[in-house]
Amino acid sequence: KQKEAWRHRKKKDQGMTTVVPALQAEGLAELSQVMLSHGDEDHVGNLKTIAKHLTIRQLIIGKGMEKIPLMQEMKKRYPKIQWRLVLAGDEWKWNETTWKVLWPKGLSQAENEDSILALVAVMKQTILLTGDASEKVEEAVAHANPNLQFSILKAGHHGSRTSSGEALLTLVQPRLAFISCGKHNHYGHPSPETLARLKATGAIIFRTDQDGQIRLRLTWEKLEVTTMLTKRKKELKQ
C-alpha cells in the first residue's frame, strides 16, 4: 500500500544529510519546540538524529501519539524533553506566536487523518499547518470554523490530489502556499488538480521539488520568501 510504503521505507538519513546541517547553518544548537504532525516515517523518521545533535526542549504531538514505539523510546532516551499532547481547541502562546489546534478532535492513532492542523499567528500573518490531512478532515475543520482565516498555507500531504480541497480553499484564499515534496517522487506530488485549485485562489506557490530549501522571514513591515535552488525572492507588505 502507498501508506505502508511511506511508513516503512528505508532511505539515507535525511536528518543527518539535510535537516541537521541546515539548522546548524542557522547557528541553532537547540529547538524550543518541535511539532510532529503524525507518525508516518517521512514526518518523524529523522527525530532521533535531530535529537542527537540538537537539544529539543519540547515535543508537540497529537494526544494518543505518545503511545507509539518511537515516542516511548524518546521518553526513555531524553527524559528532559517536555511534552505537549494536543487536541482540537488547545491554544497557547510562545514568544511572539499564538498557536491554535484545529485537529485532531479525538485521540491520535498517528495516522494521516490524525494529523495536527494548527493555526500559527506570527505578527500580522497566520499560517495553517496541515500534515497529511485529507479533504475529509479539511471539510470537518472548515465546517467547525466558518470564520477561519489564514494568509499562508502549508499544503496538505505533499500536494496530494486528496488534500487542499475545495471546502478549505473556497473558505480561505491564502496569499502564499508552500508544498513540501521530493523531486521526481513516485507519487506524482504535487498533483495537477491541487496545483490548479491553489492557482485559482491567487496564491503564490512555492514547492521544494523545484525551489529547494524555502526560507520565510517575517517582520512587522513585510514578509519575505527566498528559495535556494531557483533564487526566487518575493516580498509582500504586511
What are these regions (language model features)?
Residues 1-238:
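Non-globular, low-confidence helical/coil segments that flank catalytic cores
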